[in-house]
């Protein structure tokens, strides 16, 4: 099966990620997650193509955690129900959710009790300001991390 080049070259751990040193550098928040093995719910906020999904996948892969990737727009309630059942079966699951700013109220209400209990760890990604677009109940249970533009000297 055809695999896009971006997928083939995607980093397997945070050491392979270029840029975002304010989050991935020594003693920084995302570096500490991988070193301590303790993950928490977060929202990664930044422009398209800046590495939000790549960072989320690298963290999960590096920690060897079970995860499910969902899209707030494309996936329906049944997909969310399946993810919750997986979380119960595995006694925990990381949900990587793209376009979290477009998550409707029903899906938010469905996820909230599992976020609160710790059964689900949510890594949401958004290009929109999370303070304006994401439900305060979800937002209050997540650390909001802003990704910045990669400067020229950092690029390969």
PLM features: residue spans?
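Short glycine-rich substrate-engagement loop in P-loop NTPases that contacts/grips substrate
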Residues: 26, 67-92
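Loop/turn-to-beta-strand initiation segments
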Residues: 40, 91-94, 118-123
